Every structure is written in structure tokens, then in C-alpha cells.
């Protein structure tokens, strides 16, 4: 079997990480696959290692803008798949524009399907883009030969919007890079911490409208006001309007620039070092499909104060302390509860560390290609019966 992978709309972030990891972890010969063809931009394909069975293709349209990529998906993908004798196309970006069948797609972005979250962007190009993505992905999920979801939550939310699916679907969560795995540290009483040795709180995430960093700043400010020797470390790139809101919050609550440390983006290959310096992790997003950063925080052996929205309770289970990310007072109580109780911190960090072990790129790669193989076989059998 020859599998084609449409990576034309994968530019950065989790989508690229996913395709890099499944290709580096799959044993294609376990799935009756002889060759994999992948189409993507030069930048995307440069991040993927070379393998004897992998052919990388970059049509000139994929190095251009969104419109050019969509035109290629509609017309160029079909011809290239036929020319390469593909038996199936895997489109992990969620869009299905060409008429080639069978084709399997994937749900990786929840923002287009959660209107309340999308409205945070007001009248903007991002809102228009989310509307376009919602239309494209809804159409893609309905017309595909199979769909992969990352969580039960994501599947339920998408089905609420587009209705029940009549095609095969499955749930295959992403994996986790083992370099993030760090046995939970010994937890100390809060009396151990002081201004010279402060309690380090870490929140890794892009600064964006649905990530709520400003509420975390306000919550930690209340802890500081009560005498807790805490420092808040914020790590990640930023969306400019959200960054402005964050800076306003920092200027309001940390006037002397003493305890909020915004580090900006940190290279992915160095990120695990950041987790090692923290004493507690916070995750305050209100919109996720499968929160990779939450998995990284769990694997890093940190006690976690976590948003109660989206799939977070499904992923973290009873291994964290939850809060409403839009209510700073709830964030304050969740963090305070963990700081005040070293035994609770120890129990939660151990529980989350063991829970995250089920997220494996080996398993993700095996289950993904098994599903692709199953869809291809079913499609072939249905053609033979006609």
C-alpha cells in the first residue's frame, strides 16, 4: 500500500510535531505499507527526517499563501496522488478539497467549532479565518472516508456542530516526547520558601485570548499580597492584542517588575529545561483539542492547577486541582490549596506523572497507520462489491 500525506496546510506547532513524530516512530512494514508520499512546504518538510520509504514533494504552490495552497489542494493533490499510485490520502490538517478516495482526515483545532471562544477575536482576520476553517473542516469531516479525533471531548463538540458521522472514526491521542519525563520531586513545606528562594509557578503557552494569562497574574498578585513568596514564569510566543492585555495586567499588579517573568518563546528542544526549574504548573486555557502543554507539565512531575474547561478534566482526571480560567479568585484558591499542602502536591504530581505514561508516539503512530490500513481495505472491499 502507498500512503499519501497532505501536509500542505501544516506550517508550525502541534500539527507539524504530530506528523514528524508519527513518521519517526512508525514501523511501516507492520501495516503493509511500501511507501509514503508527503506533500508540504519546503519549511515543513525540512523538519521531517529522511527515510528510504519516504518521498517528499513540494509543489511551488505550497510555498505561497493560503489561497495558492487551497487551489493546489483542490486540483493538484488529486493528480499527484494518482501519479504516485497512492492507495489512500491522509490529510491531518482537517481540510478535504480534492475528490480522491479513500481519504482520512483529522480534527486538531477546536477554535473553529467553539463559537464562544472564536468570538473573543471580535471583527478580525482571525475570526474570518476561523469561519473559513469551520466551513472547510465541516465539509471535510462529512466527505472523508474516515476521521481521527484526539479526545472524546473533541469528537463530541464537532458532532454537535456538524451532526453525526456516517463514516468510520476513531480516537487516537498524540504522544509525548520522552525528554519531558522527570520523576516528581520531593515536595517541601511552604515554610522552606522565601524571597531569596521563592516558590516558582510556571505557565507555558502562547499568550492568546483563550489562554487567560492575565487572570493568572491577578491570582498570583493576591497570593503575593498575602505574603506568599511566589514568582510567576510565563513562557511562550504571543498574539499581539492578547500580549497588550497581559502587559497591562503586569503593569497593574507588578508595578516594580519583581515577580512576573515573561520569558517569551523558548525553543521546543530546550523547553524541558524550563519545566525542571518550576515547583508548580498552571494550565489556564479554555479551548483545546488535546493540550500537549498539559501533557508536558504532567510528565515533568509538577503538581498542577488546571482549567476545568474543554478536554482538560478528561486528560488530567483527578490528578490536578481545577479552576474556572476566567475567574481569578478560583485560580487563586487552586494555587493556594497546592502551595499550602505539600502532601497534596506530592499526591497530585505522582498521579499525573503516572497518568501521562499512556500518551506515546509509538502507540499513536501504530494506531494511526492501523486505522489508515483499515479504511483502505474497507474502501477496496466496497468497490469490489459494486
Label each residue range with its predicted role.
Residues 16-24, 199, 208-222, 329:
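A conserved mid-protein helix/loop that constitutes part of the nucleotide-sugar donor-binding site
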Residues 38-43, 176, 231-247:
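Glycosyltransferase donor-sugar binding loop
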Residues 55, 246-269:
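Nucleotide-activated donor-binding/catalytic signature segment of Leloir-type glycosyltransferases, i.e.
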Residues 74, 81, 265-266, 273-278:
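Short alpha-helical donor nucleotide-sugar binding micro-motif in glycosyltransferases
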Residues 127-147:
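Membrane-proximal helix-turn-helix segments that form the acceptor-binding/catalytic region
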Residues 286:
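Aromatic "clamp/platform" in nucleotide-sugar-dependent glycosyltransferases that forms part
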Residues 294, 303-306:
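Short hydrophobic beta-strand element within catalytic cores of glycosyltransferases
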Residues 321-328, 337-342:
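Conserved acidic donor-binding segment of nucleotide-sugar-dependent glycosyltransferases
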Amino acid at each position: 500500500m502507498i500512503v499519501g500525506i497532505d501536509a500542505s496546510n501544516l506550517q508550525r506547532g502541534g500539527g507539524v510535531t504530530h506528523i514528524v513524530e508519527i513518521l519517526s516512530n512508525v514501523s511501516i512494514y507492520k501495516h503493509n505499507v511500501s511507501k509514503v508520499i508527503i506533500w508540504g512546504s519546503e519549511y515543513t518538510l525540512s523538519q521531517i527526517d529522511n527515510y528510504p520509504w519516504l518521498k517528499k514533494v513540494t509543489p511551488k504552490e505550497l510555498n505561497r499563501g493560503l489561497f495558492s495552497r487551497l487551489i493546489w489542494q483542490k486540483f493538484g493533490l488529486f493528480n499527484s496522488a494518482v501519479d504516485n499510485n497512492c492507495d489512500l490520502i491522509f490529510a491531518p490538517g482537517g481540510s478535504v478539497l480534492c475528490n480522491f478516495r479513500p481519504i482520512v482526515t483529522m480534527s486538531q483545532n477546536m477554535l473553529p467549532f467553539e463559537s464562544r471562544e472564536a468570538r473573543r477575536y471580535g471583527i478580525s482576520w482571525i475570526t474570518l479565518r476561523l469561519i473559513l476553517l469551520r466551513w472547510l473542516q465541516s465539509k471535510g469531516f462529512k466527505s472523508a472516508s474516515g476521521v481521527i479525533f484526539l479526545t472524546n471531548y473533541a469528537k463530541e463538540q464537532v458532532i454537535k456542530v456538524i451532526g453525526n458521522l456516517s463514516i468510520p472514526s476513531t480516537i487516537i491521542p498524540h504522544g509525548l516526547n520522552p525528554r519531558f519525563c522527570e520523576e516528581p520531586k520531593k515536595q517541601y513545606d511552604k515554610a522552606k520558601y522565601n524571597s531569596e528562594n521563592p516558590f516558582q509557578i510556571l505557565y507555558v503557552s502562547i499568550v492568546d485570548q483563550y489562554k487567560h494569562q492575565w487572570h493568572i497574574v491577578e491570582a498570583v498578585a493576591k497570593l503575593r499580597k498575602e505574603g506568599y513568596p511566589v514568582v510567576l514564569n510565563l513562557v511562550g510566543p504571543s498574539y499581539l492584542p492578547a500580549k497588550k492585555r497581559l502587559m497591562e495586567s503586569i503593569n497593574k499588579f507588578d508595578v516594580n517588575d519583581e515577580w512576573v517573568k515573561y520569558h517569551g518563546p523558548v525553543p521546543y528542544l530546550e523547553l524541558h529545561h524550563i519545566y525542571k526549574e518550576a515547583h508548580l504548573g498552571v494550565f489556564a486555557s479554555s479551548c483545546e483539542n488535546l493540550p500537549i502543554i498539559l501533557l508536558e507539565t504532567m510528565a515533568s512531575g509538577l503538581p498542577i492547577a488546571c482549567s476545568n474547561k474543554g478536554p482538560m478534566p478528561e486528560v488530567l482526571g483527578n490528578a490536578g486541582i481545577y479552576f474556572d480560567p476566567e475567574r481569578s479568585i478560583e485560580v487563586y484558591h487552586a494555587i493556594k490549596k497546592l502551595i499550602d499542602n505539600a502532601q497534596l502536591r506530592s499526591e497530585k504530581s505522582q498521579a499525573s506523572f503516572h497518568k501521562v505514561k499512556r500518551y506515546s508516539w509509538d502507540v499513536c503512530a501504530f494506531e494511526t497507520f492501523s486505522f489508515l490500513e483499515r479504511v483502505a481495505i474497507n474502501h477496496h472491499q466496497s468497490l469490489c462489491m459494486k
